[in-house]
């Protein structure tokens, strides 16, 4: 963050990017970047690796909680069992559903659609990415 903020500080306002696309590095880092210039700089997160479904929903929940305004989740969506359903559930998480409730909802909907999940619900309930445990 220090390097990013120093780079931004050294630019004239008309030279600065409007959008930052970054990896989620925990609450403190996200809050720091998103509060730097909230009226002129949009902070967005990358989706990262596949992880579990809970990792996906926890990432979007925490990023939103700590100031991110955009999520760019290519792989997490493309590798999902049901792409439309995962996007719908991500939206529900952004709107207040917990990440654990999101996993339960997602698996329930897969079952209703007779789509076999890639992982059991017990495995998918786990948070496996360390940065999400902060």
Labelled PLM ranges:
Residues 7, 52-53, 89, 128:
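Residue-identity detector for threonine
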Residues 1-43, 54-69:
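Alpha/beta enzyme core
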Residues 45-50, 66-83:
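Glycine-rich phosphate-binding active-site loops on the catalytic face of alpha/beta enzymes
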Residues 64-66, 78-131:
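C-terminal helical cap(s) of enzyme catalytic domains, especially alpha/beta-barrels
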